[in-house]
């Protein structure tokens, strides 16, 4: 591969975790060693790994990180960059559900969408397009095999058809949901019996919000939801929709 670093950037709830795992599978099938071996829980940990590997000399080692934090030009140098994108009205509602935020005023909703748009603009203005691939959330959900082939083409990597199908099945919505639900049930059983739970098994958001965590993939409880794109139409109030669309609809329509 041309570069020994791959960076996946995604605003929360835009599909970056799926892309991250697809890339890890691809790189391992090509017989590269990947770092990190286990998935960190935070951007801070991810960025520490990235910083420590800015000057990798071993061409058989590939550093792959996923962040929500915007990086500067130096941090983005000599790397393949993948950015996931989604209608920010959908990512907003999905984020609120994932974080169990029931009440978010319109000001903070507008800030969420504005921040998403700023992040997209930042990356588009910072990165050499030759090494930058934008990934639409709809392709993740509707055309995963075609998307995997697109990623392979971008990286100039060939895999067999059955390998591509296997990757797609492994990270299908149903497969990931079953995997994390199994871990979630195991954590709940341990807690119910007052058994010790390893820090590597959970993400503690609050005493009432403890999520199972899979350190092999980074997926957490409720990472896969039953939310359907477009549901924001039925969840946001008519006044909220009017205000959001008056500010952002033109940009959203042009960029989605």
State what each model feature region is.
Residues 12-14, 69-72, 87-91, 97-98, ...:
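Short, solvent-exposed loop/turn segments at secondary-structure junctions
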